[in-house]
Amino acid sequence: AQDFGVPQNRERFIMIGNRLGIAPEIIFDEIFKNKRTPFVLYDALEGLPHLESRKEKGAKDVENAESGFTEVDFVYPITDFYRFINGDKKICKLYNHKNRYNNPRDIEIYRRLPQGANSLHPSIEDIMPYKKRNGIFKDKYFKLDQNQICKTITSHMKFDCNMYIHPWESR
């Protein structure tokens, strides 16, 4: 995916079969015409509104500038990434830009970790909750690096959200 404009490390197996007698080289040449220089995480996050960490449990329905909105009027910065994703369309809404609850210890871990670091980083050694089981939980916490391709974002963030710590915000 990263070779085709998606700033995530998503690998896929694609099998193509045909009975038309089209040579596989022709198909792959056509696919690889769309290959491009990869975008990085910063390209996708650039210009989005700052959000604070949500410190109150159970406040999912609260919508404001600090915690985010399900839908809000928004002027996107016109960047190469924006043009690649949206073409000439002018998008005037930002959807589902919301934070989630984090406990105070996790917020402190997020603040201390440098970009690209995981649970084994010395900056969080004194507050790491899984110290004794570091071999198992070495990537329980992972702070994304804005200058890299992002790890694959999963649909079950409820369980893995500490593996996708925002690169420059403590959330």
Predicted regions and their residues:
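Flexible, glycine-/basic-rich loop-and-beta segments that form/coincide
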Residues: 6-63
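C-terminal target-recognition/interaction regions appended to catalytic cores
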Residues: 65-171
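Conserved S-adenosyl-L-methionine
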Residues: 1-3
